[in-house]
Amino acid sequence: MGSVSSLISGHSLHSKHCRASQYKLRKSSHLKKLNRYSDGLLRFGFSQDSGRGKSSSKMGKSEDFFYIKVSQKARGSHRPDYTALSSGDMGGQTGVDFDPATPPKLMPFSSQLEMSSDKAAVRPTAFKPVLPRSGAILHSSPESTNHQLHPMPPDKPKEQELKPGLCSGALSDSGRNSMSSLPTHSTTSSYQLDPLVTPVGPTSRFGGSAHNITQGIILQDSNMMSLKALSFSDGGSKLAHPGKVEKGSSCVRSPLSTDECTIQELEQKLLQRETALQKLQRSFDEKEFASGQTFEERPRRTRDELECLEPKSKLKPASQKSQRTQQVLQLQVLQLQQEKRQLRQELESLMKEQDLLETKLRSYEREKTNFAPALEETQWEVCQKSGEISLLKQQLKESQMEVNAKASEILSLKAQLKDTRGKLEGMELKTQDLESALRTKGLELEVCENELQRKKNEAELLREKVNLLEQELLELRAQAALHRDAAPLGPPGIGLTFSEDIPALQRELDRLRAELKEERQGHDQMSSGFQHERLVWKEEKEKVIQYQKQLQQSYLAMYQRNQRLEKALQQLARGDIAGEPFEIDLEGADIPYEDIIATEI
């Protein structure tokens, strides 16, 4: 059938073999981390120069079969012009370790791509056609391989961390027509990128379909099945327990089985894998061609511009130009991959937050459904309480209006009371004046009574005197009659004298009678005047007593009404009858007029 190993590069098969063991160890997380392996595309390249002093593989021969002895060197044994290849912590993803906080610095690169001396456009590494025999970045020469890797800057030698676990191996060139040229499994080698998955990275980033990813997964599963026989022939101890193998220790592989059926079956499976890989590569080239045209047009335009503007740039070596472009593109790819990882981490955190928020939302909805009837009841109670509060507010406003009206009425009543008190004081002054006038009249009346009594006494005396005079007159008349009878007998002189005395006595009697009559008339006038004054005094006394009774009645009514108003104000101030309207009896209880006792004059 020919040498199958001649169709596949040693590093590719070795990486497949390592990936087969790695796939068995993390079969459950393979699909989850498939895209992470695709991020590692175009990061690394294998050095195919096995003749240098850095080769760590030794070859031995036993029973016409070649086996590979692989060992691991320490960190310091690596060349300084190569970056360390390590198995990443993110699901087995390998790549150059950059500090995520401080991304690597881009080399100064102009906006116009430099052209090589043979007028060919420098194509970006991410879009170069990938040969079907290699799963990593393909190079035409060891020099381009050296330019593919990131050289360590001389001023910052410790910026990138060197990680152990470089997988190195060598294949013998003899025995091309046998399966002994296949590399065996090395337990000390680190996990490499799967060559069947590497084309998925650029296509997924630059518009590739998901068919290539699924096809790569199917091919990788077939690779696992084909390499299980090799792992079982070795006893399966190394693949089943990779953690028990010590780092840095060398491992000697036992020769392969001589079963021809197994060899033919493996060769057929390898051929099938190779054809599937070629199909996948062709589909990837077709997908890459469309996206690479835009990047191919740019160097053409820049070539024309550089021919016009920078004629000296043609003298620069093509290796420097390719190195600069590759470094810039690789740094850009690394930055994009770091951004992608950050975005994935952010997406995972956001998904976790979304789950937490959904759980909280469900709990809140359950609480809402639980609290809905209680909330309706509380809302109904709040509505009732608000209605009661509005009603109480209205009643409070009405009571405040009533209180204000009562207060204004109380103020007006106080003003009226003040006026009535002033009037009462004026009336009291008048009554005092009238009482003083009445006293003076009483004194005058007493004087008049005394005078009347004196006049009565004088009239009695005059009556007695008149009676005496009448008796004397009668006696004189009797004597005169006796003298008349005795006149003719006696001398005439005695009769004349007696006759002359009679008219004088008569005149005296008339005068006394006239005086008595005058005295009687004066007495009658005085008694009538006294009676008239007594009647006037009685009438005035009755008027004064009645007026005083009215004043006392109004004063008592006003006093009682003021007492009731003061009690009502005190109750309002204490708030005893805040919500109940009350009526104040402003008229008050009328005191009977007969119960009022006036001041005795």
Curated annotation (Swiss-Prot):
Q: Which subcellular locations apply to this protein?
A: Cytoplasm; Cell membrane; Cell projection, Dendritic spine; Postsynaptic density
Q: Which residues form a coiled coil?
A: 255-573
- Tissue and organ expression note: Highly expressed in brain, in particular in cortex, the CA2 region of the hippocampus, olfactory bulb, striatum and pons. Not detectable in the other tissues tested.
Chain residues carrying a lipid of type N-myristoyl glycine: 2
Where does this protein chiefly localize? Answer: cytoplasm
Q: Which domain of life is it from?
A: Eukaryota
Disordered as annotated region, ranges: 135-190
What InterPro entries does the annotation carry? Answer: LZTS
Q: Name one Pfam family in it.
A: Fez1
Q: Where is the composition biased (Basic and acidic residues)?
A: 153-162
For this UniProt record, the keywords arranged alphabetically read as follows: Cell cycle, Cell membrane, Cell projection, Coiled coil, Cytoplasm, Lipoprotein, Membrane, Myristate, Synapse, Tumor suppressor
Q: How is it modified after translation?
A: Phosphorylated on serine residues. Hyperphosphorylated by the cAMP-dependent kinase PKA during cell-cycle progression.
| Protein's GO biological process | negative regulation of macroautophagy; regulation of dendrite morphogenesis; regulation of postsynapse assembly; regulation of synaptic plasticity
May I have one GO cellular component term?
dendritic spine
Q: Where is the composition biased (Polar residues)?
A: 174-190
This chain's function reads: Involved in the regulation of cell growth. May stabilize the active CDC2-cyclin B1 complex and thereby contribute to the regulation of the cell cycle and the prevention of uncontrolled cell proliferation. May act as tumor suppressor.
- Similarity section: Belongs to the LZTS family.
Quaternary organization: Binds EEF1G, TLK2 and CDK1.
Name the record gives this protein: Leucine zipper putative tumor suppressor 1
